Amino acid sequence: MQAAWLLGALLVPHLLSFGHGARGHGKEWEGVWGGALEEERDRESLMLKNLQEALGLPTGVGNKDNLAENSEGKEVWEATETQGEEEEEETTTTPSSSPTPFPSPSPTSEDTVTYILGRLASLDAGLHQLHIRLHVLDTRVVELTQGLRRLRDAASDTRDSVQALKEVQVRSEQEHGRLEGCLKGLRLGHKCFLLSRDFETQAAAQARCKARGGSLAQPADRQQMDALSRYLRAALAPYNWPVWLGVHDRRSEGLYLFENGQRVSFFAWHRALSPESGAQPSAASHPLSPDQPNGGILENCVAQASDDGSWWDHDCERRLYFVCEFPF
């Protein structure tokens, strides 16, 4: 009997310490601790029963004393557990409180100088990069300026070449016109006359003659006038066509000039037949019969009739045949 009691006294503290250790580790499972405690008690009772059976001791021996011992151990364990929980709550609550902020150190004069020097170094590096980029841009601008200058020089050379070609073309056309005028027209001394069967105003006719290296015909004397009359009559017979000459009084009424600006000293104006000559006057029946010039300021350009070679004043905007004169 005493041996059973002694064995129980020796085993119960170890079992309680085992249970306490299990409960200590069970802090992590606070949500399921109630069920675990009951299981622990059943496990202790089962272990004690198995030990008694293994030693051949009666099962009921020492139950009352063991129960008292277990009650005392339970009270001690619960007190220890309660104290551990309070300590854990204090430990858990303490970190949750707001930590006391550490005072930040105030910057010293050395820190300020270091900061300023650092900023100055950064600005200097940025300025250096800007200088590099500016140098690259300056180089690029110089290259572009040189390229633009070369392009301008090339364009100027091209314009000069085009102008030279135009001048050559004009001279070629003028030379061709002079040759054509002398080959196809009438050659008279140092002049050649060529009839054009295109209808043009007096100004347009002068422009076309000039483009071919000549001007509208300017007969300077009776010999040239008679030769030109024969040429026109032969070219346009049997019809009578007025043909523009290079004579006008646009500058001043009654002051007739050639296209080259020289004053006209020889005239071949149309005159109506007089009754004394035995011919029947035609002033009443033919609009071209009155003496010329008779248009005043409305008719300032001179045309030559192809049938008799007489001069008539006409409106400069009329479109007539024209005869060009070329130097030979």
Swiss-Prot record:
Post-translational modification: O-glycosylated. Probably sulfated on the O-glycans.
Residue ranges annotated for the C-type lectin domain, each copy included: 188-325
InterPro entries per record: C-type_lectin-like (IPR001304), C-type_lectin-like/link_sf (IPR016186), C-type_lectin_CS (IPR018378), CLec_Tetranectin-domain (IPR051663), CTDL_fold (IPR016187)
Taxonomic superkingdom: Eukaryota
Gene3D superfamilies for the chain: Mannose-Binding Protein A, subunit A
GO biological process, one term: positive regulation of cell population proliferation
Disulfide bonds, paired cysteine numbers: 209-324, 301-316
Keywords carried by this UniProt record: Cytoplasm, Disulfide bond, Glycoprotein, Growth factor, Lectin, Osteogenesis, Secreted, Signal
Chain positions covered by the region annotation Disordered: 58-111
Location, primary (coarse class): cytoplasm
Leader sequence residues: 1-21
Entry keyword Repeat: no
Single GO molecular function: growth factor activity
Record-level GO cellular component terms: cytoplasm; extracellular region; extracellular space
Intracellular or extracellular location(s): Cytoplasm; Secreted
Function text: Promotes osteogenesis by stimulating the differentiation of mesenchymal progenitors into mature osteoblasts. Important for repair and maintenance of adult bone.
Protein known as: C-type lectin domain family 11 member A
GN (gene name): Clec11a
